């Protein structure tokens, strides 16, 4: 026993560290914008938007779709399609190893989830990128799921919505991933010919081959606040042109000012805003639109 232990009253003497109850991990989240420490449950209840500074954190595909679609009548499209290593690609790791790790980390089989359902009773098909799955990169599976979602919308004569959160085309699939740019765009031409709305919602980040293909082809193009949207990243552009880019370059507000997008919508208001848009585009009422 040390001299300090002798001075301390018995009730406040230190306990054995091995018997202390530790604080469970993952209870707190640090906002990357204002650096506030937030209770995870509060953040999730606020759709992963910081309650102090309104910074829109990244959110999983399923959490986003859960917040968007009516609880009843949901169904998933294309979940049976899984990636294959057709090119036997290997960089620092084998492609199948990267796929396996991404599946374990996210619980998803690829970087897109597609669901049919309704928004305030208006039938829709909605697709959403999962950024945590290999950076939301677009490969053959993502392209095929997107097309099947659009085909389902075409068959049912309902609007199609896509939430993008991606670094672009998947390099491990090389030309096969680049083919998805043409494939997805061609499918949207069929929707357009049938006078069915396609709404594109750009979230942080939307880059590369996705931004260069279908991301800006929406009848209405929406973005979340301060989302990074472009083809190449700001650092790459600065290194190429050897100039400092303007403040806020490639952010939602910059694109809105330049006319590249139609509107910026807070995530917490997205469901209501989409319902109103769909009601106008479809010329039908939406029940209980906030």
Swiss-Prot record:
- Catalytic activity from the UniProt record: N(6)-carboxybiotinyl-L-lysyl-[protein] + acetyl-CoA = N(6)-biotinyl-L-lysyl-[protein] + malonyl-CoA
By its UniProt entry, which Gene3D superfamilies does this protein fall under?
Answer: 2-enoyl-CoA Hydratase, Chain A, domain 1
GO terms (molecular function) for this protein are: acetyl-CoA carboxylase activity; ATP binding; carboxyl- or carbamoyltransferase activity; zinc ion binding
Stretches assigned to the CoA carboxyltransferase N-terminal domain: 27-290
Q: Which GO terms describe its biological process?
A: fatty acid biosynthetic process; malonyl-CoA biosynthetic process
Q: Name one GO cellular component term.
A: acetate CoA-transferase complex
The UniProt record gives the binding positions of Zn(2+) as 31, 34, 50, 53
- Identify the pathway: Lipid metabolism; malonyl-CoA biosynthesis; malonyl-CoA from acetyl-CoA: step 1/1
Zn finger (C4-type) ranges are 31-53
For this protein, what does the record note about how its cofactor is bound? Binds 1 zinc ion per subunit.
Protein location: Cytoplasm
Q: What is its EC number?
A: 2.1.3.15
Q: Which domain of life is it from?
A: Bacteria
Keyword annotations of the record:
ATP-binding, Cytoplasm, Fatty acid biosynthesis, Fatty acid metabolism, Lipid biosynthesis, Lipid metabolism, Metal-binding, Nucleotide-binding, Transferase, Zinc, Zinc-finger
**Principal place where this protein is found?**
cytoplasm
Cofactor(s), names only, from the UniProt record? Zn(2+)
| Quaternary structure and interacting proteins, as annotated | Acetyl-CoA carboxylase is a heterohexamer composed of biotin carboxyl carrier protein (AccB), biotin carboxylase (AccC) and two subunits each of ACCase subunit alpha (AccA) and ACCase subunit beta (AccD).
PANTHER family linked to this entry: ACETYL-COENZYME A CARBOXYLASE CARBOXYL TRANSFERASE SUBUNIT BETA, CHLOROPLASTIC
Q: Give the protein's biological function.
A: Component of the acetyl coenzyme A carboxylase (ACC) complex. Biotin carboxylase (BC) catalyzes the carboxylation of biotin on its carrier protein (BCCP) and then the CO(2) group is transferred by the transcarboxylase to acetyl-CoA to form malonyl-CoA.
Which family, according to the similarity comment? Answer: Belongs to the AccD/PCCB family.
Q: Which protein are we looking at?
A: Acetyl-coenzyme A carboxylase carboxyl transferase subunit beta
């Amino acid at each position: 026993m040390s001299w300090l232990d002798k001075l301390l009253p018995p009730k406040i003497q230190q306990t054995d560290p091995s018997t202390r109850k530790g604080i469970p991990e993952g209870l707190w989240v640090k906002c990357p914008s204002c650096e506030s420490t937030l209770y995870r449950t509060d953040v999730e209840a606020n759709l992963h938007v910081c309650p102090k500074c309104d910074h829109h954190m990244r959110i999983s595909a399923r959490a986003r779709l859960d917040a968007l679609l009516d609880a009843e009548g949901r169904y998933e499209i294309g979940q049976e399609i899984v990636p294959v290593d057709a090119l036997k690609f290997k960089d620092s790791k084998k492609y199948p190893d990267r796929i396996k790790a991404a599946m374990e980390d996210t619980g998803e089989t690829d970087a897109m989830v597609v669901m049919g359902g309704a928004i305030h009773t208006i039938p829709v098909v909605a697709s959403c990128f999962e950024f945590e799955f290999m950076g939301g990169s677009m490969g053959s599976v993502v392209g095929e799921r997107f097309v099947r979602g659009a085909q389902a919308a075409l068959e049912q004569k309902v609007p199609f919505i896509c939430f993008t959160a991606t670094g672009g085309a998947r390099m491990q699939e090389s030309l096969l991933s680049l083919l998805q740019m043409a494939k997805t765009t061609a499918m949207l031409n069929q929707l357009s010919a049938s006078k069915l709305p396609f709404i594109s919602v750009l979230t942080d980040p939307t880059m590369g081959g996705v931004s260069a293909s279908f991301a800006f082809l929406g009848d209405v193009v929406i973005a979340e606040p301060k989302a990074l949207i472009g083809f190449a990243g700001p650092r790459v552009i600065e290194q190429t042109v050897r100039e400092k880019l303007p403040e806020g370059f490639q952010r939602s507000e910059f694109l809105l000012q330049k006319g590249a997008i139609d509107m910026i919508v807070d995530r917490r208001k997205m469901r209501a805003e989409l319902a109103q848009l769909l009601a106008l585009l479809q010329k039908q009422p939406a029940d209980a639109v906030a």
